[in-house]
């Protein structure tokens, strides 16, 4: 018996927005060993670390838009919290959280 056709609808989940101590960044360079260099919306380059919880679930590459949590005791370093997909980036642009020009400029 064939399987039933089910509508392929993406679940509409909330897109994480930056809170205090968090910012949106673009991956600039992969360093290896779960470290990357990211260019943030505040204009700073930071050394980012991929925590073990998302290391194997989420693959990163240059040009990806990510949400990072900035370290309190070392503001030039951060942890990757979430990787935005293309549809989520569009939702952030539509909600005026970020502008398309800034993302294009950060991506180079």
UniProtKB/Swiss-Prot annotation:
One of its GO terms (molecular function) is RNA binding. Residues 11-85 form the S1-like domain. One of its GO terms (biological process) is translational initiation. Keywords: Initiation factor, Protein biosynthesis. The keyword Magnesium does not apply. Pfam families: eIF-1a. Seems to be required for maximal rate of protein biosynthesis. Enhances ribosome dissociation into subunits and stabilizes the binding of the initiator Met-tRNA(I) to 40 S ribosomal subunits. Belongs to the eIF-1A family. This is Translation initiation factor 1A. It comes from Saccharolobus solfataricus (strain ATCC 35092 / DSM 1617 / JCM 11322 / P2).
């Amino acid at each position: 018996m064939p399987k039933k056709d089910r509508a392929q609808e993406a679940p509409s989940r909330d897109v994480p927005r930056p809170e205090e101590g968090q910012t949106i960044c673009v991956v600039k360079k992969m360093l290896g060993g779960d470290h990357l260099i990211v260019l943030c919306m505040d204009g700073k380059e930071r050394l980012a670390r991929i925590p073990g919880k998302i290391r194997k679930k989420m693959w990163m590459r240059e040009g990806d838009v990510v949400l990072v949590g900035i370290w309190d005791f070392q503001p030039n370093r951060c942890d990757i919290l979430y990787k935005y997909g293309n549809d989520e980036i569009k939702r952030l642009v539509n909600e005026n959280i970020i502008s398309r020009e800034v993302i294009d400029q950060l991506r180079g």
